[in-house]
Amino acid sequence: MGRRSRAAMLPTNIILLQNLVKRDPESYQEEFLQQYAHYESLRDIFMLNGLAGGDSAAATNGLDVGNGSSTMAGTNGTTMSTSTSQLIELVGFVSQVCSCFPRETANFPSELKQLLLEHHKSLPFELKEKILSCLTMLRNKDVITAEELIQSLFPLLVAYSSHGNSLGVNSHAKELRKIIYTNLISLLKSCNTNGKNQKLNKSTQAVCFNLLDQPDSQGIWATKLTRELWRRGIWDDSRTVEIMTQAALHQDVKIVMSGVMFFLDADREREENFEENSEDEDGFDLDALRHKMQVNKKTGRRGKKLENAIKTVKKKKKNGPGAPQGYLNFSAIHLLRDPQGFAEKLFKEHLSGKTKNKFDMEQKISLMQLLSRLIGTHKLIVLGIYTFFLKYLTPKQRDVTRIMSACAQACHDLVPPEVINVMVRKIADEFVSDGVANEVAAAGINTIREICSRAPLAIDEILLQDLVEYKGSKAKGVNMAAKSLIALYRDVAPEMLKKKDRGKNAAMEVQEAKKGGKDSKRPQFGADNSVQGIAGIELLAKWKKEHGEESENEDADANWEVDVDSEEDDVDGEWVTMDSDKEYDVDMEDSDDEKDNAKGKESDSDLELSDDDDEKEVKDEQEDADIDPEAAFREIASTRILTPADFAKLQELRNEESVAKIMGIHKQDKREELVDASTLTGPIKYKQSREERLQKVLEGREGRDKFGSRRGKRDNMRSTTNREKERRKNFVMSIHKRSVRGKQKMSLRDKQKVLRAHITKQKKKGY
């Protein structure tokens, strides 16, 4: 009887039939075919009804199929017919069990795609939502491929776009776009989890390129999808960057700004996303979970929890900071295939062309920042950008500090100095002059310093010396800005400063260069500044000459084993640890006479020098100071092979030189360093209101006791002891006591006993 009642319920209870079909498909094949035939009939009715007309009414109010069919309320407030709900239920049922009957449902996925793509205007929102979820389910069951699903989702995403489309104003268009966009991200993420699915990625990127080729604004979805996949580290190749390059050169303003902001902010967003994921995994404690498993009752659930925890820890170690990242950690700007062409097109089409007026000021500043970052990173030549900056370099300009930071980033040593000099002169005239505020002057000098740090020849001596005079300003920001400019040119070109501003070390270098007839340290435009040979090799040659280790007869074992017990180790400083996995070339032809020569010279160094020896020492110091790096490299490279000890000592000498240098401005690649607009104004301290000062006073009082007497304030409430009362008693009241008067009559012997007893008691105190 139970089986008969169950069989009677199957045609109406789809959920029960679905469960039974999954358990035993062969036994319930007839019931499945019955429901599948019902689905086909409803589908045909919907398709015919959609072709007949009533697109807008069907889209908003549902479709009443059949005569006298009742309606029911939809999930979003619209009326939905019974046949619509039946079709939704049957579509979900067939999608769940189609893998059990692959022959009977071979055309089911294509029918769903046809129904969705050709009749989406007439289908109710609930049915479209159900078909989208079913297509995603079919892809998860490997019934359809990921490429087929993407080909079904992208046309709908474009069709329901709100830009220039009547369907975009549909009440459910926003929900549909969100569903499609989320499904696309999840699909691409799952397909690229175990490894890069290059076939799927290239096909999806081709669709994005096709969207951006169209002149309308539908390509905004290509930029949104690309940026999100870049943030998650799913797409990280140059083809992805080319999509955003094409977007930045588009005709539509929204697409252009989407591409521009990708190059400005996408890398930072990706790093933040990676750090957030790392922080989520850092809060896990495996040892605590193992302890709980040992103490608590062992169950299957806790065992699975422990297994999942171990997998999480292994994944964390695999993807941790020490392991290679799952994506290429390259900036998007570095992956450009033609940065020079991209920069020229960006400037020509958006900043200097006929379409420049369609961007507002905020968008123009973003374009300036991107263009300047491209020029500074790749050392490009776009000469028109420097004259374009001139009309915006005024103190009254909105967001002028961001424009000034873009000016600094766009400068490098390959740009002709006369081109940048015009911009520097404009900044000096507008910002660094009499009558301007201290913050304006500080911003101007700091901007000039940032420009000159990238292109030292961009300023002439007269203007530099005028700006340096602001070092005596009473304003702290202006003072610090001028001193930073002095510190820069002390290291780069000290001869451009006045003698009083050069400093001791820089003045000595200039004087020695003049006496020795050497070339000026001032950089020359177009000169090759690439590193040749080994950096700091002259320091090693000087050190060997001082310590008498320039002889060709050296001990090979001593050179290889750096940490040896010798007198030189005590003189030269700490031991040097050598990496065992590195390979070094060692000169094996050295003899064993080095130690004897070194010991003999060390014994001579303890003797006092005569006047002749002093003169000789001064002469040697001058010769050491005049060591040419190229000559030292040629000499050492042609006479010996550097050993691990030599490389270790060379690194040590480099560190000593950097520490010993008083005005040590670190030389670094200024192209990669971004200029923060907030740092150009310098330290600004505005006058505080009474409420702000009072708040600062109250913050200082937190965590400390109130000032005043501690009398009567004890940690534990109690009365005073007799000893405390006797000690605090007024001396005039206790001067006549017998014990006090007896001290005056005490003999010397008794006083000594009391003193010794007191000392002994003090020593024993605390033990």
Curated annotation (Swiss-Prot):
Pfam family, one: SDA1_C
Biased segments, Basic and acidic residues type: 511-522, 697-729
Keyword tags: Cell cycle, Nucleus, Phosphoprotein, Protein transport, Ribosome biogenesis, Transport
Biased composition (Acidic residues): 551-573, 586-595, 605-629
Location relative to the cell: Nucleus, Nucleolus
Compositionally biased intervals (Basic residues): 730-746, 754-767
Annotated GO CC locations: nucleolus; nucleus
Other comments on record: Present with 3640 molecules/cell in log phase SD medium.
Family statement drawn from the similarity comment of this UniProt entry: Belongs to the SDA1 family.
Database matches in PANTHER family: HSDA/SDA1-RELATED (PTHR12730), PROTEIN SDA1 HOMOLOG (PTHR12730:SF0)
Quaternary structure (record): Associated with the 60S pre-ribosomal particles. Interacts with NAP1.
Protein name listed in UniProt: Protein SDA1
Organism: Saccharomyces cerevisiae (strain ATCC 204508 / S288c)
Gene name of the encoded protein: SDA1
